[in-house]
Amino acid sequence: MDDVRSVLLIAALSNAVKHKSVPAAGAVMGAILGTHPELRSKAGEIKGLLGSVLEEVSSLSAEDREEKLKTIAPDQYASLFEKKEKKKIGLPDLPKAEGGVVMRFAPNPSGPLHLGHARAAFLNDEYIRRYGGKYILRIEDTDPKRVDPDAYDMVREDIAWMGLSIAETIFQSDRFSKYYEVGKELIQKGHAYVCRCDNEKFKDLKMHKTACPCRSQSPEEALDLFDQMLDGAFTEGEVGVRLKTDLSHPDPAMRDYPLFRVLTSTPHQRVDAIVYPLMNLSVAVDDHLLGMTHVIRGKDHIANTKRQEFIFRYMGWETPVYRHYGRMGIEGVVLSTSQMRAGIQSGEYSGWDDVRLGTLRAMARRGIQPQAVRNAVVEIGIGETDIQFSWENLYAKNKEIIDSQADRFFFVPDPVLVPVSGSDPVVAKAMRYPGDESRGYREIPFAGSLYLPKAELESGAAYIRLKDLFNIKVLYEGDIIRGEYAGDDLQEARSKKAPIIQWLPENHANPCTLKTPDGDVSGVCEPEAVTTQDRIVQFERVGFARIDAAGNPAVAYFTHR
């Protein structure tokens, strides 16, 4: 447990130095389990060590705490004293970016892209636009267990929807020979070896900072074994290639991590291979060979960055400039690809664009504009602080884009047909867009009976203003509801604080289903609203909607209010 104790010691010293006091047990424990999720299963053992560590740190003077932290974890010490930059509008400048950048968006084709992917995609795209250069789409498909064949096309479609400035598309599955070349070079230089230890044995040695017997191989022996791997001499799980790192590194995950594995149980549809590169090897190789100048990704990749830097140093390559942004919590939608797929297969979700999902195609089907998503994630920026994604902010930005384009129409949810007496037939004229007569008027004919929202009637409203028409009294006679004309005066309705509601005549009502995250809403709408598919409209008193299926009956997807 020495390595765990060293991690505890760093966390306790950091807490004490940051707050200029003795370390707080709860904060130290939370920091450990938050930054080292692999230790959560050992929480009980950690608590047993925590007391002695806290006692040791508490016994030190403030100066000694700083000195000790500076010695054993200089990066952690430095991060505590970094000056916080004043918040700027827009994204911060990137170092070494003048003259152009080469950047990449690198999704795994396990399913369609979602809002989390959009953050990385748009942030990189913004910097390409700012500095000029080359934006590469790199499909990271080296793990056949995580590849959905249909996702290749879905990713392309999502990229097109976002409007990214992609200059070149690369498939990692086309580049295995390049990974093998670098793997052999690392072995020849004595930086990698072929490990035949079973996983449990190696894990035990690693946790004790002890080299496995395979580590002492000569480059010639290791190369011969690697060639045997490529020739199919080993079975899955029997052997792998590991990078020689630092066995005394405080983070066990950094110690001699794997570069290649044998995989035969899951064939890859694009490559006939037995030996597969692991992510840190393929990413490092491609970031170098493709000339990446800057890499922007989530801080959950900080450990991967450190792993990849070993490869860059061993190969004598110049490392890109790395920036890591904080986690973005997204509530209210499903983002897990496996959970989405299971829901689709069970019939819980209608498809990858079901409105309850957080995929970009679900956003598009609802009428969310790609520019609105771009604006929202750029505003969030690339800071390392974890944030909560604001749907209201996204909706506000989307409204800025679609509001002026969206004609207004009536949609009556859960319609109840109500006869209205006392008025001659009349044609109501309602503006297509408030305050803009140049857009014209809708004509809605009234001739005796009309549809009203069930919710308004269930509230027991006795006096109602029919928007753009007239006032009515509502009479409830057992199960029968009827209306009586009560004049045209809008001011009278306002003085009575009467609800002003949407309505539709029986002969001018197009059946329409409004799909929302809370379920389908049956209703009727103006026929003019649903003449064109993919149109964005605003249903008055309901919200914006995208027309998904035009005609009679119609289907609309709720966007937001």
Swiss-Prot record:
Transmembrane segment boundaries: none
Motif 'HIGH' region, residue range(s) on this chain: 107-117
Localisation per UniProt entry: Cytoplasm
Biological process (GO), any one: amide biosynthetic process
Catalytic function, reaction form: tRNA(Glu) + L-glutamate + ATP = L-glutamyl-tRNA(Glu) + AMP + diphosphate
Cellular component, GO annotation: cytosol; protein-containing complex
Enzyme Commission number, as recorded: 6.1.1.17
GO MF annotations, alphabetized: ATP binding; glutamate-tRNA ligase activity
Name of the top EC class for this enzyme: ligase
Alphabetical keyword list: Aminoacyl-tRNA synthetase, ATP-binding, Cytoplasm, Ligase, Nucleotide-binding, Protein biosynthesis
One of the Pfam families matching this protein, by short name: tRNA-synt_1c_C2
Keyword Nucleus recorded: no
UniProt xrefs under SUPFAM superfamilies: Nucleotidylyl transferase, Ribosomal protein L25-like
HAMAP family: Glu_tRNA_synth_type2
Entry function: Catalyzes the attachment of glutamate to tRNA(Glu) in a two-step reaction: glutamate is first activated by ATP to form Glu-AMP and then transferred to the acceptor end of tRNA(Glu).
Family per record: Belongs to the class-I aminoacyl-tRNA synthetase family. Glutamate--tRNA ligase type 2 subfamily.
Protein's recorded name: Glutamate--tRNA ligase
